[in-house]
């Protein structure tokens, strides 16, 4: 690992703006799930590159954290820390990554920075998944809340040809994407592209099935891309309660937030004077089902 560089805030005082000079060197600037092409002057070094990252992603960066710039090395087939004294001389791909892992996740949710992921709530799973009817009910409540608050929703279906479509109880009105998949994780190229179109996304609220497979793999992949993940415990389940329990324990240890549907919805409105509070209050007046799910988190 390269030596620690100055914090982003220390370099934010000036420098290159969003518009690079014509005739510059093309560079692909990557951060989290995003990738944006731009150009920089020939010979641009570390400080100029940081300024360019700031111009592209400044509203998504914690300005007090330290980051490292990495270069994609063709000979290794992966990113490596930017060599000391590096200067841009040809087309290349760079990414900005945190130099140190955050040990504490605050878990603040706001509607403009949040996306809901509903994972594989399909008909063929109904007889196999524990408390499936309960998680459908809670999942539908979450989707109603998303519509009220204008939060984008992405839904996937695992091999729908064999496992059927999303259950009829789930209302797909206003959903941004419904995608078939064979991969267990929801992080498909189409999902990454959809996230890139939504400015300022920091958090994903994740629910569905199965906790220890598709939910777990989706959560870990999102966290690896710098997205904060909230798993809704009363809206996710597995065929085996043991698999579910140990998956949630493992995910919580990695800094993923295990929460409930009511906690999510009330955190998103945050204030009784919020213009949508009454509608959200009506949603949660009837408590979520008291199933065996929450006794086995």
From Swiss-Prot:
GO terms for cellular component: peroxisome. The modification Phosphotyrosine is found at residue 159. It holds the Pfam family Isochorismatase. Keywords: Phosphoprotein. The modification N6-succinyllysine is found at residue 278. The keyword Nuclease does not apply. Belongs to the isochorismatase family. This is Isochorismatase domain-containing protein 1. It comes from Mus musculus (Mouse). The lineage of its organism: Eukaryota, Metazoa, Chordata, Craniata, Vertebrata.
